[in-house]
């Protein structure tokens, strides 16, 4: 089933190894296939990955976009342990992330980590 994507003016979306930049008007289109897709607003860059949850997200994002779990596995496991130590109360959520990684459902793992990012934003500094 194709994915329907709606983009605002000048919004960006990553499709595989390419970035699509919308023109000055709102648009929608369908994408059919297994290529990884992420909106720019749902990405974390290496430069902005400045918290344990953001570093984990960035690592899983790279697994997803590059379709290469093995390449990032060692980094992922280290970041997961770091986050488990820093946030022991998030064990269930981190367990769900790990299950998604093991099952190959990387986009679902990213969605779980986004919950951590939201909690991290709300936490007092």
Language model features with spans:
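Terminal leader/tail segments of proteins
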Residues: 1-125
